[in-house]
Design a protein with these regions (language model features):
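Secreted/periplasmic carbohydrate-active enzymes, especially glycoside hydrolases
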Residues: 1-229, 252-260
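Active-site-adjacent "subsite" loops/lids of carbohydrate-active enzymes
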Residues: 172, 231-255
Length: 262
């Protein structure tokens, strides 16, 4: 039995925050060798070169021999490319302290794959590919993680503004809080989608989140619907703006929260 209690005090922000546990909570069970939670990082260019880094954990007394990572890119159900490599023993990143695994050896693998003639993600055609990462031990798949991603290039210039895939794009944006009006702060995917559909009908193509890290469901829907996102992390830093806001926890939690956010 696991019991979680929320100690709610107000005012804790300058806006309606809601109270309680209003987003999904995961209790994850992993094999002793596994891919870290949120441990797959994907970057790409418009030529279709996709760089993937996967972070893994295993018992310290377990040799890395016999462990492999297989990455496979799909376009819908169509297999585009695949790559299998032996796991590295070394880890070149940082591991957030709250989820540190006792007596774990950490490793990271980076591989670059090629999507021929990629369909680019765009606000008018938000095309998404799917990456399946399999951790293999002695020939058997023991852990699988699936991520969706788009192939695109985003850049800002000081004199001409924003470009997406080399095309000049005007940002028609809004500042959007996480609550759902009369429905409150609890995450509701269909209600979020309804709101985003209405914003798109108004001509919105970009959203700045306010003023905390957005829900996973919100980010997934923006990817699927062709909406650019300026994702804001904090509104309070070390100096508080209200009596019970995030400034109370900033020194202890900011670095860890950013790691899980990114």
């Amino acid at each position: 039995l696991i019991t979680v209690r929320v100690d709610h005090h107000s005012p804790n922000s300058r806006w309606y925050s809601g109270a309680g546990i209003y987003r999904r909570v995961w209790l994850k069970k992993y094999p002793e060798c596994h891919i870290l939670s949120d441990g797959v990082y994907i970057s790409s260019d418009i030529d279709g070169n996709v760089t993937i880094t996967a972070e893994t954990a295993r018992p310290k007394d377990m040799p890395v021999a016999g462990l492999q990572l297989r990455q496979t890119i799909f376009d819908g159900d169509k297999l585009i490319c695949t790559s299998t490599n032996n796991c590295n023993a070394a880890f070149d990143g940082s591991f957030p302290e709250p989820v540190r695994i006792n007596e774990a050896a950490l490793g990271s693998n980076t591989v670059t794959m090629k999507i021929p003639e990629p369909v680019l993600w765009d606000i008018e055609n938000p095309h998404l590919y799917s990456l399946t990462t399999d951790l293999i031990k002695d020939g058997e798949v023991i852990h699988t993680v699936i991520n969706k991603f788009g192939v695109r290039k985003a850049e800002f210039t000081c004199d001409k503004g924003f470009f997406l895939n080399g095309r000049h794009v005007k940002l028609h944006g809004c500042c959007e809080h996480h609550d759902l009006g009369a429905l409150g702060a609890a995450v509701n995917r269909s209600a979020i989608k309804r709101k985003l559909v209405k914003l798109r009908e108004m001509g919105i193509n970009a959203i700045r989140t306010s003023h905390n890290m957005p829900a996973v469901e919100f980010m997934e829907l923006c990817d699927e619907m062709g909406i650019l996102v300026l994702s804001e992390g904090f509104d309070m830093w070390e100096k508080p703006k209200t009596d019970y806001d995030y400034a109370r926890f900033f020194r202890e939690w900011a670095d860890k929260d950013v790691a899980s956010w990114v």
